[in-house]
């Protein structure tokens, strides 16, 4: 029991030193971040694995300790990597109109709603978005273990074929610009979904504007 208490205290101390505090986007309340969850789960899994491989009580405790330390390092590593990247993107994109969302422990989503970066019906990238994308590229370049998928979306105005092509072209324009900002082409892909994935009501002007968007998914390599 004393051993497990020390183990848990150690994992919480480790996460307290390393983890970046996150807050819920809706409530503003502090959340347990990915690094903290990863360290704790990794430590417990490592301890359990180590405990069942020892020959006697002392050996099992020793193996459990080593397993906990190794599990904590692995479990917290990826989560911490994304916690830091998320924090940098929030700081970089404040007041830009681009939303930063955490989809899960190891996936981020940047949302450029309301046609940000493009004129109506056009796939030419507007110069007004260059500075924002420069900031995104600068952050991404510091995290080489992630990859990007740029997804283009339209509202329901116009025909399906036109919308599909427009969504693909806009996604490729953002992809091309980021590659021009030193993001390696092997780290980024572009896809278009036309009007197939609305996130707002296409029956209203505001809803259609919301659906005209480009999203950048950030995933582990």
PLM ranges: what are they?
Residues 1-9:
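Sec-dependent signal peptide recognition
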Residues 14-16:
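C-terminal motif of bacterial Sec signal peptides marking the signal peptidase cleavage site
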Residues 40, 44-48, 85, 89, ...:
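Stable alpha-helical elements in mature extracytoplasmic
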Residues 83-112:
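Amphipathic, membrane-active segments
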Residues 103-134, 154-161:
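Short, solvent-exposed beta-strand/turn patches at coil↔beta or beta↔helix junctions
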Residues 118-151, 179, 209, 216-221:
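Periplasmic peptidoglycan-binding/anchoring modules of Gram-negative envelope and division proteins
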Residues 151-221:
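Periplasmic OmpA-like peptidoglycan-binding domain that tethers envelope proteins to the cell wall
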